[in-house]
């Protein structure tokens, strides 16, 4: 399974990449929305984790662009955020996210979400 992790935090990217690699995933990382959009067409991930708070192109905008592309509209997107408010979760749903994972998350929480989308 190919999973993309989009986060401006190197620590989050590396942590998620390590956990998912150990679970048999091919992981593609991106530092922001622009980086992600340039890699999505080539890598065609099966699942995308996107941080909300990023410079240049935030997670909401990135998710909306992914979901509005017919080729990737069916690709599950999980939003990552340190914000746990109803407004933030609702905004994620409006732009098309499938799920919301609040940081800091545990390895078990990450794997629980991952397993829901595993092919």
Report residues per predicted region.
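Charged docking surfaces used in two-component/phosphorelay signaling
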Residues: 14-22
């Amino acid at each position: 399974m190919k999973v993309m992790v989009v986060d401006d935090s190197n620590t989050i990217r590396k942590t998620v990449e390590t956990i998912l690699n150990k679970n048999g995933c091919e992981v593609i990382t991106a530092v922001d929305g622009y980086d992600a959009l340039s890699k999505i067409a080539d890598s065609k991930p099966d699942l995308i984790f996107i941080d909300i708070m990023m410079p240049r192109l935030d997670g909401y905008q990135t998710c909306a662009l992914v979901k509005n592309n017919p080729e990737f509209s069916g690709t599950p997107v999980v939003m990552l955020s340190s914000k746990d408010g109803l407004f933030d979760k609702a905004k994620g749903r409006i732009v098309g996210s499938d799920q919301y994972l609040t940081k800091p998350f545990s390895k078990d929480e990450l794997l629980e979400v991952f397993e829901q989308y595993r092919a």
